[in-house]
Amino acid sequence: MSIFVDETTKVVYQGLTGSQGRFYGLLNRDYGTQVVAGTSPKKAGTDVDGIPVFANVGDAIEATGATASCIFIPAPGVKDAVIEAAGAGITFIVCITEGVPAHDEAWFFNKLRRDFPGTRLLGPNCPGIISPGKANIGITAGHIAKAGGPVGIVSRSGTLTYQALYELQQKDIGVTTCVGIGGDPVPGTSFIDCLRAFEADPETKAVMMIGEIGGSAEEEAADFIKSSMTKPVTSYIAGVTAPPGKKMGHAGAIVSGGKGTAAAKMEALRDAGASVGLNPTEAGELMARVVAEL
């Protein structure tokens, strides 16, 4: 099995007619994802390489039965795009867009929880999600992901998501689903959300978790691992040498006031029983040992 998306998931791309939306929408379709529609208010009635374009998400759902969306809308329009998708009945939204104001993120995070509890948002500012061999929604390179399980991956970092997939592929270890939750301060889907889903998935036997400096998400995940995970977890935390007060790539990747350090996160994870690597390759080697003992 996989979590959140599989070969039956039908996806509408909000922003399919833009350069990035078109590029990745077609790439995802070529991977095997059911990319059934795009939206663009000014280009309704046209198509992108055979994919029909509709004026809005509601029209796309009515025509195609889409249940998921992928957002490639410029940052100022993301708030409206998220609520449009949720209001139309989309149950899984992947938002790739970077630079969404934190105020907007907090607003639609709470709006979804209050008014659309049946809708899950992944992102913003994330690489997306891939269930290898089944579906790829976002910007992850499908050729580095080996299908077949038994490992689930969840990561805050985009590039380290790819590195984790590559490390496992090199060791001939398959992945059920790889989720990039994004590095912004207010992610729609958390480490804990993914850990809980992997724990419930019968085909996922172990989990690799990639964290980074800033915030307390990894410490909270460690508490969940300690209290609720029966499956082994390996981890890597990026930013061991990051100077305090300097943002490292993501809006959420900053050590402030002595909090959010890599050392503190690694200690919390070790205390929870997770195996912690000092670099991505070591994290992959730790997972290889875990898989060998399954």
What is each stretch, according to the model?
Residues M1-L294:
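Catalytic-core regions of core metabolic enzymes
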